[in-house]
């Protein structure tokens, strides 16, 4: 009887040891793994006019970072915050996301904000396709013209000077109020 009890204890301890080793391995813990969308979204992105969007995608669906406009009178970087679908569909659809930049920093206050809403599409040529709304503070009488609408495509490849020039000549607009005011 004593040998059976000792054998049972030994088997139990071995099982506990194997279970503890398996759960100590972070690659086995789904919470420790970074989602493909999270890993793909995090980084530095550029739009067709050369503006820079630096973002970190959190496991909880948060987007944080900075936006630096390449056009208009914007100076330095502006804080951005947003959200993305941290559990996106697995059917090949894009990952829904959106973020906002209030055009106020230590250098300027344009009394406006831009929101981008779109989809992250991963792969070899990852991109973020967005539509944006730029709303500026106005008088009640001018409220009808307070919001501009446009679109941006962001990639992780910085555009060349020639492609930026071509986009400008094609009339591509942007979500920067400091540029819109001058137009």
Swiss-Prot record:
- Which residue numbers delimit the Avidin-like domain? 37-159
- Positions that bind biotin: 67, 78, 116, 132, 144
Task: Look up the domain of life of the source.
Answer: Bacteria
Q: Which GO terms describe its molecular function?
A: biotin binding
**What's in the keyword line of the UniProt record?**
Biotin, Secreted, Signal
Q: What does this protein do?
A: The biological function of streptavidin is not known. Forms a strong non-covalent specific complex with biotin (one molecule of biotin per subunit of streptavidin).
Task: Name the family.
Answer: Belongs to the avidin/streptavidin family.
Descriptive protein name: Streptavidin
Protein's organism = Streptomyces avidinii
